[in-house]
From Swiss-Prot:
GO terms for molecular function: calmodulin binding; zinc ion binding. A zinc finger (TAZ-type) spans 233-324. The BTB/POZ domain mediates the interaction with some component of ubiquitin ligase complexes. Pfam families: BTB, zf-TAZ. This is BTB/POZ and TAZ domain-containing protein 5. Residues 1-25 are annotated as: Disordered. Its main location: cytoplasm. The gene is BT5. Coiled coil: none annotated. It comes from Arabidopsis thaliana (Mouse-ear cress). SMART domains: BTB, ZnF_TAZ. Induction: Up-regulated by auxin (IAA), salicylic acid (SA), hydrogen peroxide and cold. CDD domains: BACK (cd14733), BTB_POZ_BT (cd18313). Interacts with CUL3A.
C-alpha cells in the first residue's frame, strides 16, 4: 500500500453498492457463506476493502494499527462514523478517526461487514462480543441482529453467558438478554461458579443481587406450578373415580356390580375401575371396617363414598351404596368440615368444566 496516495475516490471505479440487508436465508449457499448478499457483490466489496484502492479514511486502532477505508462506504453504513469523519478538521485528502478498545482484527471484521454485510464463521466465533459492542456503539442494527442470532444458535454457553448478559443490557439487546437470563436460571449452579460470575460479583454487585432474587423467584414459581399440577392431577383422578363408581354400580364391570362381563380380563374404558373393585371387595370382607381408625383402606373407601354422595345429582335413583344415607349425614357435620368438603367438591368438579357427567353436579352449583 506504498502507492496509495496516487489514488483518490474520484479516480477509482467502485463496484455497485450492496443491497440492503435481507432476512437470513435458509438456502444452503447463504448459510455456508455466512452472508446476506450475493457472492459476486460480496467478492467485489471485499476486494475493494482488502486492496484499499482510493481509500480516503485512516482508522487508528489499538497497538498503533491502521485500517484503510472509504468514507462513502462506512459513512453510509454508520451515521456515527459519518459524524466522526465530519469532525476531522485537518485539511488533507485523507480523514483520520480513532476506534480504540477492541482488538485490531475485530475492528477489521467490523469494517469489512460495513462493506459487504458478511463475515467469516471463525471471525464471528472469535470476536462476537466485540462485534456486538461495535454494532451498538456505531449503530449498525443489522450487525447487532447477526450477533444476537449467532449467540442464540451456537455461541452462547455457560462460561460466557454472564458477560453476554451484561453486554445485552448495555447494548439494548432485550431478546439476547432474555435468552441469557433463561440460561442462567436453568444452569445456575454451574454458572455461579464461572469466572464471569465472580467478576460480576466484584464489579456489579447490584446486578448479582438482582439475578439471585430472580433465581429465587423462579424456583418459588416452579414449586407453585408443580404443586398446582399435582393438585389438578389428584382432582382429575378423583373425578374419574367418581365416574367409575357410577359405572360399576349401575352397569357392572368385570367381576363386580349388577352384571358381570363375559370377558373379566378385558379392561373397560374407566381406568379407575380396577382399583375401585379391589377397594369394594376389601370393604365387603374387612373385619376392621366398623372400628374407628382400624383400616386405612376402608377409611379411604368411606371417603370416596362420601365424596360421591356430595356430587351426586339424584341420590334417590343412584345405585351407588349408601349415597342417600351419607347425604343425610351431611346435615349433622360441623361447619368447618362442611366447608372443607365443599371446597374439595368444587375443585373435583372443576376438572370437567366441559362435558361433565349427567349424574354429577356442576362446579357452579357448589357455594362455599
Amino acid at each position: 500500500m506504498e502507492n496509495m496516495d496516487d489514488f483518490s475516490p474520484e479516480n477509482v471505479l467502485a463496484p455497485p453498492p450492496p443491497p440492503p440487508p435481507m432476512k437470513k436465508s435458509t438456502d444452503l449457499f447463504m448459510q455456508r457463506s455466512n452472508s446476506f448478499v450475493s457472492k459476486a457483490t460480496r467478492d467485489s466489496w471485499d476486494r475493494m476493502f482488502d486492496e484499499a484502492h482510493g481509500a480516503d479514511v485512516l482508522i487508528h486502532t489499538d497497538d498503533n494499527g491502521l485500517i484503510y477505508a472509504h468514507s462513502n462506504v462506512i459513512g453510509m453504513a454508520s451515521d456515527v462514523i459519518r459524524g466522526m469523519m465530519k469532525q476531522h478538521k485537518r485539511k488533507s485528502h485523507r480523514k483520520s478517526i480513532s476506534i480504540l478498545g477492541v482488538p485490531h482484527h475485530a475492528l477489521r471484521v467490523f469494517i469489512r461487514f460495513l462493506y459487504s454485510s458478511c463475515y467469516e464463521k471463525q471471525d464471528m466465533e472469535d470476536f462476537a462480543i466485540h462485534l456486538l459492542v461495535l454494532s451498538h456503539v456505531y449503530v449498525v442494527p443489522h450487525l447487532k441482529r447477526v450477533c444476537e442470532s449467532e449467540f442464540e444458535s451456537s455461541l452462547l454457553n455457560k462460561e460466557n453467558v454472564i458477560d453476554v448478559f451484561q453486554l445485552a443490557l448495555l447494548c439494548d439487546a432485550p431478546r439476547l438478554g432474555l435468552l441469557c437470563h433463561r440460561m442462567i436460571l436453568n444452569n445456575f449452579e454451574e454458572v455461579s461458579t464461572s469466572e464471569g460470575w465472580q467478576a460480576m460479583k466484584e464489579s456489579h454487585p447490584r446486578l448479582q443481587k438482582e439475578l439471585l432474587r430472580s433465581v429465587a423467584y423462579e424456583l418459588n414459581s416452579l414449586k407453585q406450578r408443580n404443586r398446582k399440577q399435582k393438585e389438578i392431577q389428584t382432582y382429575t383422578q378423583l373425578y374419574e373415580a367418581m365416574e367409575a363408581f357410577v359405572h360399576i354400580c349401575r352397569d357392572g364391570c368385570r367381576e363386580i356390580g349388577p352384571t358381570k362381563t363375559e370377558t373379566p380380563h378385558m379392561s373397560c374404558g374407566f381406568q379407575a375401575c380396577n382399583g375401585l373393585e379391589q377397594l369394594l371387595k376389601h370393604l365387603a370382607g374387612c373385619k376392621l371396617r366398623s372400628i374407628p381408625g382400624g383400616c386405612s383402606r376402608c377409611k379411604r373407601m368411606w371417603q370416596l363414598l362420601e365424596l360421591h354422595s356430595r356430587i351426586c345429582v339424584d341420590s334417590e335413583q343412584c345405585k351407588v351404596p349408601l349415597c342417600s344415607s351419607l347425604k343425610e349425614r351431611m346435615k349433622t357435620q360441623s361447619r368447618k368440615d362442611e366447608k372443607r368438603w365443599k371446597l374439595l367438591v368444587r375443585n373435583v368438579l372443576s376438572t370437567k368444566r366441559i362435558g361433565g357427567s349427567p349424574f354429577f353436579l356442576q362446579a357452579i352449583d357448589v357455594t362455599l
